[in-house]
């Protein structure tokens, strides 16, 4: 049988208050569903149906494209990779989103789709702080902004996810023989 393992700190067991046990039961329920393959994600219970899974794959592709573009221009931002590795999220497609959702305090006792988890992150993140990294995404940042991203890898990881979730999609370029 699968091993059920929790991702979250469960708190003290001796002082009794009704909320921590309720939270622990909810987290345990999702950990059990995860162990039996009924939900995906590591820290969050995320729907594993076809729509949510397609959204997760699309999110990861956008995240990777944003990260690659920034890293090519500003190699010092590689520290965001370290922040992602240290988060130890096992679902590769959702790992960046789960890591930043945990950083900003998104509620782990809710059942999410990829889209609703992304929206929960956007609702909780510091938008002004995320916008401060915009010059890196536009390719117009100075060395100081790149150094800030390197010094704050978790915050920059949040900015990468924010950019992947909020940037308009670029139109697909196709070649036409008639042109």
Each model region followed by its residue ranges:
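Patatin-like phospholipase
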Residues: 1-179
